Amino acid sequence: MRRIPALLIPLLAARLLAAQTASAASEIRSGDSLHAALQPDQALVHYRRALALDSANYEALWKASRALVDVAKQMDGKGDALKKRRDSLYVEARRLAEAAVRINPVGARGHSMIAQALGRLSRTRGGKERVRFAKIIYDEAERAIALDSTDDIAYHVMGAWHAEVKRLSGIQRFFAKTLFGAGFLDRGNWDDAQRYLLRAVALKPQNIFHHLELAEIYVDVGKYSLARDQLRALHDLPIADVLDHQYKTQAATLLDDIKNEKDET
């Protein structure tokens, strides 16, 4: 058996690494095409393949996290097995996003995906667990915005955070004060909920969920005319997310519910 000259080993290793990197990039491109086609489960297959080739690939990590969130958020059922599976996907999405942050701490997407994964997971949990997640969601969304002022999803998460804090019950707020101290949840307010969602809409006006969540906040504060404007604005927007059909149905129902409501403020 012929021995490889020692001087050639670094060159061969470099060529192998380059080939793996190119293959990982190809898998990511395939995943991106499937993501755009609203097939997150198939996109995830390619992102996982990319990670098998290059486990430290930042782009593959955060995009795999995104695909997991997109798969999980479609699991809408009451069975315990389904709920357990859904939540496990959110947990894995968080893990991959955290790995992305370790690889690239100054990349906004990793921080944004941690906030998204935990934001989605928190909505499936009871009050105490939602409160436990609150500080991480806030910190990660804030960090994402600081790193990339055009990250519309991070603005959405931040606006939703303020709204969810305002919707907490008195008991949940008491628990939060015990856990984090008196001041943390005092940051939550309706003005910032509106401001952040308005920014998300401005950055990506074709995003249906931005309009829907902003409309729901307007309903909370009695601004029914503005809520109706947002609900009507999303009606003709193209489908670009796996839940957009559901969001449009929710918007139509809400619009009908508030059609005769008069502004309170």
PLM ranges: what are they?
Residues 52, 102, 202, 235-236:
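Amphipathic alpha-helical segments of tetratricopeptide repeats
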Residues 171-179, 236-265:
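Terminal, low-structured helical/coil segments at or just beyond the last alpha-helical repeat
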